[in-house]
Amino acid sequence: MSKDNPKDFGTPSDSKERLKAIETAMTQIEKAFGKGSIMRLGAESKLDVQAVSTGSLSLDLALGVGGIPRGRITEIYGPESGGKTTLALSVIAQAQRAGGTCAFIDAEHALDPVYARSLGVNTDELLVSQPDNGEQALEIMELLVRSGAIDVVVVDSVAALTPRAEIEGEMGDSLPGLQARLMSQALRKLTAILSKTGTAAIFINQVREKIGVMYGNPETTTGGRALKFYASVRLDVRKIGQPVKLGNDAVGNTVKVKTVKNKVAPPFKEVELTLLYGKGFDQLSDLVTLAADMDIIKKAGSFYSYGEERIGQGKEKAIAYIAERPELEQEIRDRVLAAIKEGRDPIAAVPETPALAE
């Protein structure tokens, strides 16, 4: 290789040859590691996979395939009371509305049937298991998935999947890496079965802080590294800002959901949703935000208008106006869905969070 021409080092100099070489390499990578292992970051780079809606139009759009991918593992993690279980139950409600069968493995023994019903979950048809230990939970999950009759299975949560040896041992016993090994072994088996049956598996996870981290994000998730690797989608869900208020009363929170990993569409998309206490995610607020981003609803300063009609000053009044007119809501929803089908995507990618995007 000469110093004057650094491209002599085995690199095709012609742009067409370089493009052909890249395409060949990408084809080889996909053959070796599966479709979705490498892709261009452009919005059109999506895999043709079936999905279950989350109930949020903007989150479905951010996920790139219309919701939680079927036949794959999705991890939903974040701090406490951020909306992780609410999001998982919302997915279950959408799957049931489409005629699907769902299961909820309640390792935390904390599922509230009344709250689940308020989110639209048909609790009479929901399969629920409250296992005694981590091995039992994952074995039940495997049997359900192998049946081929389950559309969505949720595990709440990974942190509560306590290994049998830890439960049977003495308080204070040191059992390093036991839960991580349990997760690694289970996920190796589950990945192939999920792909064959088309079941969407959702693992809810908690975050912990790594001791002694001076720089960067000190947060990490429980259960070792296996889930990070096997998950096709990882969603970071957390509260942001001040509580949403109606008068002087707090009625909800703003929740930020970020796709920190996505093997079925370009990752790093971020959306903000309104989580109302006792009611779940505000789908109308989400619709108004998305319609405004697409210029279907016009926004001039604090005023919102649709067509020639001014519908309110401020987002709350615009939402209240549309809520009183179901036919107007459906018209706006139809226009947003049509725009999505045409390929319009107002949700931009944002930088990743290094510590949790492994």
UniProtKB/Swiss-Prot annotation:
Pfam families: RecA, RecA_C. Keywords: ATP-binding, Cytoplasm, DNA damage, DNA recombination, DNA repair, DNA-binding, Nucleotide-binding, SOS response. GO terms for cellular component: cytosol. One of its GO terms (molecular function) is single-stranded DNA helicase activity. It comes from the Bacteria. SUPFAM superfamilies: P-loop containing nucleoside triphosphate hydrolases (SSF52540), RecA protein, C-terminal domain (SSF54752). Can catalyze the hydrolysis of ATP in the presence of single-stranded DNA, the ATP-dependent uptake of single-stranded DNA by duplex DNA, and the ATP-dependent hybridization of homologous single-stranded DNAs. It interacts with LexA causing its activation and leading to its autocatalytic cleavage. PANTHER family: MITOCHONDRIAL DNA REPAIR PROTEIN RECA HOMOLOG-RELATED, RECA. Belongs to the RecA family. This is Protein RecA. It comes from Deinococcus geothermalis (strain DSM 11300 / CIP 105573 / AG-3a).
